[in-house]
From Swiss-Prot:
Residues 1-27 are annotated as: Disordered. Residues 9-31 form a coiled coil. It comes from Nematostella vectensis (Starlet sea anemone). InterPro entries: DUF4519. The lineage of its organism: Eukaryota, Metazoa, Cnidaria, Anthozoa, Hexacorallia. It comes from the Eukaryota. The chain crosses the membrane at residues 30-50. This is Single-pass membrane and coiled-coil domain-containing protein 4 homolog. Its main location: membrane.
Length: 62
């Protein structure tokens, strides 16, 4: 088992299981929240750039 920082006691199996469960929950949170938010921001940026350039093209044609 791993040595806990600043403590003489080593990590127990129960502590290891709880730590792994917390890591798994954190990973699931990233997958379900952070990635879709980043994707939405990226899509909005692309839509903004496309709309800004298409407006500019209309003026250039006249």
């Amino acid at each position: 088992m791993r040595q806990l920082p600043g403590k003489a006691a080593k990590e127990t199996r129960k502590m290891k299981r709880e730590r792994k469960q917390q890591n798994k929950e954190g990973h699931n949170r990233v997958v379900t929240v952070a990635i879709p938010v980043c994707l939405a921001v990226f899509v909005m940026l692309i839509v903004y750039v496309y709309s800004a350039t298409s407006k500019h093209r209309k003026w250039a044609r006249r």
